[in-house]
């Protein structure tokens, strides 16, 4: 009997991939080469392995879901939102705490955003998952960096055409007032924006699968946050359905320890960890069923 095998690709986007020169594009306006905004070391190789897995055994996959980090240029986690005490720009990779804002070390550029910003930081820090990080502008809506890695896009397109079906796309991150690492819900859900709240239909879709293979970027952030939220809202007896494809995921540099701790905790809870080569036989068998 054919099994329901689901591939979840988390943010397989150009801005997160350390792609070689031939994958880059030239901006026709500036005539400059457009480079990834937040390249994760190893991500290009991860994408090639994912693409190969789909190309070789895609007929064994019942479903593919692709999450897309999706931001406006003006966003609470982008430099354009912030200034320092002297009114100067805030550099990417700056961590900003609620106390920093209360002390005036960093401030939102728009004064009328102060109260909401403080409330957000208070809620974020109370959750204990992340501090606010100012990232370079990335995955901006409409940009090359927002697009899916070329090899993954091509193999997913072939999978869609061969089966007359769609690879479901999940948009996250377009609310500029909250960070949205997880595809399940934002770090601080906005009560006025359902897109930031728990995506129960997505959880239910995953729960209906016999196996869920998880891959993408980055292991220290969006893969971690998404998987943790899935685990939180899954039946505890079903966690072995989840399989992290360890050679198709890489962490952001400097966050390797957090990624390692995440893998250890997931294993402890019953989530499986495997390589693409190790799951290939199951997909091929399902393809033939």
Regions found by a protein language model. Give the residues of each.
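Conserved residues at the C-terminal ends of beta-strands
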Residues: 67, 173, 215
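Short, contiguous clusters of charged residues that form electrostatic/catalytic patches at enzyme active sites
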Residues: 45-48, 150, 197-204, 225-228
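Short, surface-exposed loop/turn motifs that are enriched in glycine and acidic residues
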Residues: 137-142, 192-195, 216-220
